[in-house]
């Protein structure tokens, strides 16, 4: 799947938004990818996951024992990646502000895991999820995401395979360009709201 085909899937789902957005990282952006909209169609979600699975090297795929994703945004993407790879898919969640495996999910000691995200901006949620997998006894050997919007700066500590890289400028709240500052900010993501 080419980058243009991936973007066409987002456009068809009305998931590529323009405006002033507060990202889960706290950074601001003029564009937002609402992955929940692109993933709400099971056939589209499967196509995107299968295209991403194709990008992961076979030498890594054969080592994997499961897929783990962070709730909330990564749950559907992780489930579809599990289907594409023929692996169980689990998720970590933050009942107390810190990611944990719950709901009876467990990893065998040393089990090799693919961390699956919907979007990576700073990599903070991914690193927190990797820590939770390690604390549960697993070993994340690679990460994947539908979209890398980090401008190449996210360091997850493991090989990272995005379906598409979108270089959309992000800004600190105190360093907004005037045209963005003039638009009221909205927070469409899944992490708790940050002070504006």
From Swiss-Prot:
Gene3D superfamilies: 3.40.50.2020. Orotate binds at residues 121, 149. It catalyses: orotidine 5'-phosphate + diphosphate = orotate + 5-phospho-alpha-D-ribose 1-diphosphate. The keyword RNA-binding does not apply. The keyword Glycosyltransferase applies. InterPro entries: OPRT, Orotate_PRibTrfase_bac, PRibTrfase_dom, PRTase-like. GO terms for molecular function: magnesium ion binding; orotate phosphoribosyltransferase activity. This is Orotate phosphoribosyltransferase. It comes from Rhizorhabdus wittichii (strain DSM 6014 / CCUG 31198 / JCM 15750 / NBRC 105917 / EY 4224 / RW1).
